[in-house]
Amino acid sequence: DITTTEIDDAFSVELLAENRVRVGVHIAAPALGIVRGDAVDAIARARLSTVYMPGDKITMLPTEVVAAFTLPEGGLRPALSLYIIVDRGTQEIVATETHAELVYVKSNLRHNTLDACVTEEALASGSGDYPHKDEIAILWPLAQALFEKRQAARAGYGLRREVPGNTDYNFYVEGEHVTITPRRRGSPLDLIVAELAILANSTWGAMLHDHGVPWIYRTQRTLAAAG
Protein backbone atom coordinates (compact mmCIF):
# COMPACT_ATOMS: atom_id res chain seq x y z
CA ASP A 1 0.00 0.00 0.00
CA ILE A 2 0.97 3.66 0.15
CA THR A 3 3.13 3.13 3.27
CA THR A 4 5.37 0.51 1.64
CA THR A 5 9.01 1.58 1.41
CA GLU A 6 10.57 -1.81 0.61
CA ILE A 7 9.16 -2.36 -2.88
CA ASP A 8 10.76 -5.68 -3.70
CA ASP A 9 9.00 -6.95 -6.81
CA ALA A 10 7.90 -5.58 -10.17
CA PHE A 11 6.42 -7.09 -13.32
CA SER A 12 6.73 -6.40 -17.02
CA VAL A 13 4.64 -7.53 -19.98
CA GLU A 14 5.73 -7.70 -23.63
CA LEU A 15 3.46 -8.98 -26.40
CA LEU A 16 5.08 -11.43 -28.83
CA ALA A 17 4.05 -13.09 -32.07
CA GLU A 18 2.00 -16.30 -32.23
CA ASN A 19 -0.29 -15.26 -29.35
CA ARG A 20 2.54 -15.38 -26.85
CA VAL A 21 3.62 -12.94 -24.16
CA ARG A 22 6.88 -12.38 -22.32
CA VAL A 23 6.31 -11.74 -18.63
CA GLY A 24 9.12 -10.49 -16.43
CA VAL A 25 9.25 -10.98 -12.66
CA HIS A 26 11.81 -8.54 -11.27
CA ILE A 27 12.98 -8.96 -7.67
CA ALA A 28 14.96 -6.27 -5.86
CA ALA A 29 18.52 -7.48 -5.28
CA PRO A 30 20.20 -5.67 -2.36
CA ALA A 31 22.52 -8.67 -1.92
CA LEU A 32 24.35 -7.44 -5.03
CA GLY A 33 25.59 -4.50 -2.96
CA ILE A 34 26.49 -6.39 0.21
CA VAL A 35 29.83 -8.07 0.84
CA ARG A 36 29.92 -10.91 3.34
CA GLY A 37 31.16 -9.59 6.66
CA ASP A 38 30.79 -5.89 5.85
CA ALA A 39 28.87 -3.39 8.00
CA VAL A 40 25.56 -3.83 6.17
CA ASP A 41 25.86 -7.62 6.33
CA ALA A 42 26.44 -7.37 10.09
CA ILE A 43 23.30 -5.27 10.56
CA ALA A 44 21.19 -7.64 8.45
CA ARG A 45 22.51 -10.67 10.34
CA ALA A 46 21.71 -9.00 13.67
CA ARG A 47 18.18 -8.00 12.67
CA LEU A 48 17.44 -11.11 10.53
CA SER A 49 14.08 -9.75 9.34
CA THR A 50 11.97 -6.63 9.06
CA VAL A 51 9.82 -6.17 12.17
CA TYR A 52 6.26 -5.05 11.43
CA MET A 53 3.92 -3.39 13.91
CA PRO A 54 0.71 -1.37 13.49
CA GLY A 55 1.68 1.90 11.86
CA ASP A 56 5.44 1.34 11.94
CA LYS A 57 8.27 -1.09 11.20
CA ILE A 58 11.98 -1.66 11.70
CA THR A 59 13.58 -2.66 8.41
CA MET A 60 16.16 -5.43 8.24
CA LEU A 61 18.47 -3.23 6.19
CA PRO A 62 19.41 0.38 6.99
CA THR A 63 17.17 3.06 5.49
CA GLU A 64 19.90 4.23 3.08
CA VAL A 65 20.34 0.70 1.71
CA VAL A 66 16.58 0.23 1.32
CA ALA A 67 16.39 3.50 -0.63
CA ALA A 68 19.21 2.41 -2.94
CA PHE A 69 17.69 -0.97 -3.82
CA THR A 70 13.91 -0.59 -3.52
CA LEU A 71 12.01 -0.43 -6.83
CA PRO A 72 10.49 3.08 -6.90
CA GLU A 73 8.52 4.64 -9.71
CA GLY A 74 10.96 6.28 -12.12
CA GLY A 75 13.96 4.48 -10.65
CA LEU A 76 16.66 2.45 -12.39
CA ARG A 77 17.58 -0.36 -10.01
CA PRO A 78 19.44 -3.70 -9.94
CA ALA A 79 17.15 -6.71 -9.94
CA LEU A 80 17.14 -10.45 -10.43
CA SER A 81 14.70 -11.06 -13.27
CA LEU A 82 12.83 -14.19 -14.30
CA TYR A 83 11.40 -13.99 -17.82
CA ILE A 84 8.76 -16.47 -18.91
CA ILE A 85 7.26 -16.99 -22.35
CA VAL A 86 3.56 -17.83 -22.02
CA ASP A 87 1.13 -19.24 -24.58
CA ARG A 88 -1.90 -17.01 -24.03
CA GLY A 89 -4.28 -19.63 -25.38
CA THR A 90 -3.34 -22.27 -22.81
CA GLN A 91 -1.47 -20.18 -20.20
CA GLU A 92 1.32 -22.74 -20.43
CA ILE A 93 4.90 -21.59 -19.85
CA VAL A 94 6.98 -22.57 -22.87
CA ALA A 95 10.36 -21.07 -21.89
CA THR A 96 12.16 -19.32 -19.03
CA GLU A 97 15.36 -17.34 -18.59
CA THR A 98 17.01 -15.52 -15.69
CA HIS A 99 19.11 -12.36 -15.69
CA ALA A 100 20.74 -10.06 -13.13
CA GLU A 101 20.18 -6.65 -14.66
CA LEU A 102 19.18 -3.02 -14.22
CA VAL A 103 15.44 -2.43 -14.63
CA TYR A 104 13.57 0.84 -15.04
CA VAL A 105 10.37 1.02 -13.00
CA LYS A 106 7.67 2.89 -14.90
CA SER A 107 4.92 2.86 -12.27
CA ASN A 108 4.21 1.83 -8.69
CA LEU A 109 0.69 0.39 -8.29
CA ARG A 110 -0.80 0.52 -4.80
CA HIS A 111 -3.29 -1.97 -3.38
CA ASN A 112 -5.06 0.67 -1.32
CA THR A 113 -5.97 2.66 -4.45
CA LEU A 114 -6.58 -0.15 -6.97
CA ASP A 115 -8.13 -3.12 -5.16
CA ALA A 116 -11.57 -1.49 -5.21
CA CYS A 117 -11.61 -1.15 -9.01
CA VAL A 118 -9.48 -4.11 -10.14
CA THR A 119 -12.05 -6.75 -9.23
CA GLU A 120 -12.89 -10.15 -10.67
CA GLU A 121 -16.04 -8.66 -12.20
CA ALA A 122 -14.20 -5.72 -13.79
CA LEU A 123 -11.57 -8.03 -15.28
CA ALA A 124 -14.22 -10.39 -16.66
CA SER A 125 -16.18 -7.58 -18.34
CA GLY A 126 -13.27 -5.33 -19.26
CA SER A 127 -14.91 -2.44 -17.44
CA GLY A 128 -13.26 0.30 -15.41
CA ASP A 129 -10.35 2.63 -16.04
CA TYR A 130 -7.09 2.19 -14.12
CA PRO A 131 -3.34 2.26 -14.79
CA HIS A 132 -1.86 -0.58 -16.86
CA LYS A 133 -5.29 -2.11 -17.43
CA ASP A 134 -4.17 -4.09 -20.50
CA GLU A 135 -1.14 -5.56 -18.74
CA ILE A 136 -3.17 -6.53 -15.66
CA ALA A 137 -5.73 -8.20 -17.94
CA ILE A 138 -2.91 -10.35 -19.35
CA LEU A 139 -1.46 -11.25 -15.95
CA TRP A 140 -4.81 -12.15 -14.35
CA PRO A 141 -5.55 -15.39 -16.30
CA LEU A 142 -1.90 -16.41 -15.93
CA ALA A 143 -2.13 -15.99 -12.15
CA GLN A 144 -5.35 -18.02 -12.08
CA ALA A 145 -3.71 -20.80 -14.11
CA LEU A 146 -0.66 -20.84 -11.83
CA PHE A 147 -2.92 -21.00 -8.78
CA GLU A 148 -4.89 -23.94 -10.17
CA LYS A 149 -1.69 -25.78 -11.09
CA ARG A 150 -0.46 -25.41 -7.51
CA GLN A 151 -3.75 -26.70 -6.15
CA ALA A 152 -3.48 -29.78 -8.35
CA ALA A 153 0.03 -30.35 -6.98
CA ARG A 154 -1.25 -29.93 -3.42
CA ALA A 155 -3.96 -32.51 -4.06
CA GLY A 156 -1.31 -34.90 -5.34
CA TYR A 157 0.46 -34.59 -1.98
CA GLY A 158 -2.77 -35.16 -0.08
CA LEU A 159 -3.08 -31.50 0.97
CA ARG A 160 -6.26 -29.49 1.07
CA ARG A 161 -7.00 -26.81 -1.49
CA GLU A 162 -6.01 -23.29 -0.47
CA VAL A 163 -8.93 -20.95 0.07
CA PRO A 164 -7.98 -17.31 -0.63
CA GLY A 165 -10.10 -14.51 0.71
CA ASN A 166 -9.06 -13.92 4.32
CA THR A 167 -9.20 -10.32 5.46
CA ASP A 168 -6.02 -8.48 6.39
CA TYR A 169 -5.82 -5.00 7.89
CA ASN A 170 -3.77 -1.89 7.19
CA PHE A 171 -2.93 0.52 10.00
CA TYR A 172 -2.28 4.22 9.36
CA VAL A 173 -1.02 6.27 12.30
CA GLU A 174 -1.07 10.08 12.14
CA GLY A 175 -0.21 11.56 15.52
CA GLU A 176 -2.83 10.25 17.94
CA HIS A 177 -5.24 9.29 15.15
CA VAL A 178 -5.23 5.65 13.99
CA THR A 179 -7.08 4.48 10.88
CA ILE A 180 -7.67 0.76 10.34
CA THR A 181 -8.83 -0.37 6.91
CA PRO A 182 -9.63 -3.94 5.77
CA ARG A 183 -7.82 -5.53 2.86
CA ARG A 184 -9.11 -8.73 1.28
CA ARG A 185 -6.46 -11.34 0.69
CA GLY A 186 -6.92 -13.12 -2.61
CA SER A 187 -7.99 -10.07 -4.60
CA PRO A 188 -6.89 -10.15 -8.26
CA LEU A 189 -3.85 -7.94 -7.67
CA ASP A 190 -2.95 -9.90 -4.56
CA LEU A 191 -3.18 -13.19 -6.47
CA ILE A 192 -1.09 -11.85 -9.36
CA VAL A 193 1.69 -10.74 -7.03
CA ALA A 194 1.58 -13.94 -4.98
CA GLU A 195 1.53 -16.39 -7.88
CA LEU A 196 4.31 -14.70 -9.85
CA ALA A 197 6.48 -14.49 -6.72
CA ILE A 198 5.84 -18.18 -5.99
CA LEU A 199 6.70 -19.02 -9.61
CA ALA A 200 10.01 -17.15 -9.34
CA ASN A 201 10.84 -18.87 -6.05
CA SER A 202 10.03 -22.35 -7.34
CA THR A 203 11.83 -21.82 -10.66
CA TRP A 204 14.98 -20.52 -9.02
CA GLY A 205 14.78 -23.17 -6.30
CA ALA A 206 14.73 -25.87 -8.97
CA MET A 207 17.67 -24.22 -10.73
CA LEU A 208 19.74 -24.16 -7.55
CA HIS A 209 18.77 -27.76 -6.78
CA ASP A 210 19.97 -28.81 -10.22
CA HIS A 211 23.33 -27.17 -9.48
CA GLY A 212 23.65 -28.56 -5.93
CA VAL A 213 23.32 -25.16 -4.23
CA PRO A 214 21.50 -24.95 -0.84
CA TRP A 215 18.32 -22.84 -0.81
CA ILE A 216 16.32 -21.60 2.17
CA TYR A 217 12.59 -20.92 1.95
CA ARG A 218 10.63 -18.85 4.44
CA THR A 219 7.31 -20.43 5.38
CA GLN A 220 4.24 -19.05 7.11
CA ARG A 221 2.44 -22.09 8.40
CA THR A 222 -0.68 -21.71 10.52
CA LEU A 223 -0.57 -24.14 13.44
CA ALA A 224 -3.76 -25.64 14.83
CA ALA A 225 -4.48 -24.74 18.44
CA ALA A 226 -4.08 -27.54 20.95
CA GLY A 227 -6.97 -28.32 23.23
Walk through the language-model features, giving the residues of each.
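Electropositive polyanion-binding surfaces
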Residues: D1-G227
